[in-house]
Amino acid sequence: MKKVLLILACGIAAPLSYAQATPKWAGKAKKAVFSIVTYDKDNKIKNTGNGFYINENGTALSDYTLFEGAERAVIINADSKELPVLRILGANSMYDIVKFNTETDKKTIALKSASQPASIGETVYLLPYSTQKAATCQTGTVTKVDTIGDKAYYYTLAMTTNEKTVSCPIMNANGEVLGLIQKNASDEAKESYAIGATYGASLSITALSLNDMSLNKIGIKKGLPETEDQALVYLFMASSQQNQDEYITTLNDFLEQYPNSADGYIRRATTYMGFNDDEHNALADADLKKALEVTANKSETQYNIAKLIYSYTISLGDKKPYGDWSYAKALSIIHDAMQADNQPIYTQLEGDILFAMKKYPEAYAAYEKVNQSSIASAATFYSAAKTKQLIEGTDMNEVIALMDSAVARFTKPYTSEAAPYFYERAEIKAQTGKYREAVIVYDTYFEAIGGGGTSAYD
């Protein structure tokens, strides 16, 4: 810490040497400005710079360059208190700006964004980081204002700045923040530039941010989207791009931000179950119970839990199940859901579970109900046909009729999606001695997969 403060102290004197004015609001406003130290993967100091708070929740802005390649970062506030950077909340490498949040130890002093952009010729104030009691400011004037987005601006200033003032705030006469100073080509340059604070505040994490190159070049943990729906899409994307431990961390962050999300608990339970051990299964079981506690749609949550336990039991093989997880438990849960809200998709799952339990007549009865509903499809008729085929004493013509209904769901020209159904239909016809009809269906199958061959019965 002493080493860090020594490095920072060397940079304090530079902006003070050309201080020209001290507005009344500067004494309080300077408490929003802090210094930043970033560290590399070996925990060695990578860069030092500045930043400032834009709200009392610890949200802040700084330059992207300072954070690029960093694995962690801390801020040292005006009271010389060191606080860790917790999450990156948005970044834009082209405009060299990053949004993040830090841990807070008490009420945070934050700068209020200006409601209107600065005008050309207006006097502005550069507020540097300082641990000194007295606040000092450097003045300059606005020479150009460019619009870079919705209520977002880029300022050209008649002001000489140096490396030590990068990411310090530019204020108007009312003590409102206009932007943050960007790195200049030369310390002797007569012009400086500032990116609008409102632009920085608008940066966010979206559902697609996992593929954002600018964000991925920062090793510090990222935040989540600000709406639950977007955050759930983010979780879906993360599930295929992160390993189990990373994904668990993301899920933990999600549930911290959205503690009443039944979907979040079910997704974390699913991930825990992927570890295939009793320790994680116990955590999964607790999450499934929590999902039922917080859900706004109990039947839907019961459906998702029943489906999860059903899938778990299928994958179990000859292994001993965890606790009471079984087909019977999954069936009991889906029956509870159906009593409150008898959706066809719930009946479909009921049929799947009964089929796995080898209760074929009951499974067929469930599939028949589905086939008379709005979600009837080639797949549901196929399920009914395969189940009917396994019931002792079944007339195979009934099975063929069900497969006829399955393929009737497709229209010409047939595609590869229809091919498996035509193949199964042909197989059943061949098994019942209807070889000529089977050949015709096999030919349709070959057409569907784009082949020119014919069946073995030619």
For each predicted feature, which ranges?
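C-terminal cap/linker of serine protease catalytic domains
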Residues: A21-P23, L180-T250
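A conserved glycine-rich beta-strand in the N-terminal activation segment of trypsin-fold
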Residues: A21-T22, Y39-N57, D63, E82-P84, ...
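Flexible, gly/ser-rich surface segments that form the specificity/activation loops bordering the active-site cleft
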Residues: A21-W25, T108-Y154, T161-V166, I181-Y193
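Conserved active-site neighborhood of the chymotrypsin/trypsin-like protease fold
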Residues: N55-L127, Q132-T136, K151-Y154
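Alpha-helical segment of the N-proximal tetratricopeptide repeat
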Residues: P225-D278, D318
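Structural motif corresponding to the intra-repeat A-B loop/turn of tetratricopeptide repeats
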Residues: Q241, F275-D278, Y312, D324, ...
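Residue-level recognition of tetratricopeptide repeat
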Residues: T270-G274, K307, I314, D352, ...
